[in-house]
A protein has these predicted regions:
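Non-globular targeting/processing and membrane-anchoring segments
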Residues: 1-129, 207-340
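Mature extracytoplasmic/lumenal regions of exported proteins
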Residues: 130-153, 157, 161-258, 262
């Protein structure tokens, strides 16, 4: 087993507002700015855990069955840095594959930051966590601004926070890149930048988290097939799709849609993922939870009359947590699709 990287792990705990006693960052945690950060995050996290994560942890083993125990790869396209929900639904995955258009950013180093800017950098970090803790998803437009701050920029600080708060210990962090064949090349050499984080979770075995900066539109994949080639080498996995902007409802995203339909042992999604019409009865077993109310106002053009009709004809078990764009549990719904 790989030894923990004390610097990366301490940085993750520091950014997550968790104790760093006995680490090189202990002195930094005596600053008022960090104490405020830790108290604010503790409070927000407690509410978030009670409202969302604790309920998912209770619901997922029974609802997902064998997929919950699956220790293969886990695909979460259009995820941004949302390791939180990936890990809550599928805690046993060997490899988490996340992606988004947001940059990875540099590896955070608290010791190189001026003590004058640290309080504002931590406040900005809390601000970028606001939407996922309040509404269960990142707002892409806001993230572009939040993640551009000069200190603690990119998705890595958020991934650190989520890993630390999920009770994981970071073993190693490496900036990577992919070439046209989907193979790893040194960071800066390939056209698809990413990060590879090896961590040990509560299950006490090494797991790997990848996050890649990439565009999943068909035209972008034609120009830059790197990420798709990498995924093909991972094989069959479990898939999560949540607050995916209904992008795969457009034929401009047919390649990623086709990949997930062909390579998923299970797909857990809200209605913003793959359109209902692709899950035909002869090929898929479908189970529904919650109440389907259609898209929120911003995405009304993506209504699915076939889904609405079929959902109205049968009742579904309630969903104890919110999921996707409908941020109240009583208005949320999800679908679990398993290939026959």
């Amino acid at each position: 087993m790989q030894a923990a990287d004390p610097t990366a792990d301490a940085t993750a705990k520091f950014l997550a507002g968790l104790p760093v006693n006995g680490t090189p960052l202990e002195n930094y945690s005596s600053a008022t700015g960090w104490k405020t950060h830790a108290a604010d995050l503790d409070r927000a996290w407690k509410q978030f855990d009670e409202r969302q994560l604790a309920k998912i942890r209770e619901w997922a083993p029974q609802a997902l069955g064998p997929a919950y125990q699956d220790n293969g790869p886990m695909y979460y396209m259009f995820s941004g840095p949302d390791f939180l929900y990936a890990n809550a639904f599928f805690p046993n995955a060997s490899t988490y594959i996340l992606c988004g258009t947001e940059p990875v950013g540099p590896i955070p180093d608290i010791t190189k930051m001026s003590q004058h800017v640290l309080p504002s950098a931590l406040a900005n970090l809390r601000k970028s966590l606001d939407s996922v803790l309040s509404w269960s998803f990142f707002i892409t437009k806001n993230m572009k601004v939040d993640l551009r701050q000069q200190q603690l920029s990119g998705t890595l600080p958020l991934l650190y926070v989520f890993l630390a708060r999920a009770g994981c210990t970071i073993d190693s962090v490496e900036l990577v890149a992919l070439d046209k064949t989907g193979a790893f090349v040194p960071a800066g050499k390939g056209t698809t930048p990413g990060v590879k984080i090896v961590f040990t979770g509560p299950a006490a075995r090494p797991q790997t988290l990848y996050y890649f900066t990439t565009d999943l539109a068909d035209w972008a994949i034609n120009v830059n097939p790197n990420f798709g080639k990498f995924c093909e080498q991972q094989g069959q996995g479990v898939t999560l799709l949540k607050a995916a902007s209904y992008l795969m409802h457009s034929d401009n995203f047919s390649k990623v849609r086709g990949y997930l339909l062909a390579h998923s042992k299970v797909i857990l999604q809200d209605d913003s993922g793959i359109p209902y019409r692709f899950f035909t009865n002869d090929k898929w077993d479908l189970r529904f939870y919650g109440k389907y109310l259609g898209p929120i106002n911003r995405f009304l053009k993506n209504k699915q009359p076939d889904l609405e009709k079929d959902r109205a004809a049968s009742s579904s078990p309630p969903l104890p947590f919110s999921f996707g764009y409908q941020w109240q549990p009583s208005r949320s719904s999800l679908m679990i699709a398993t290939p026959k």
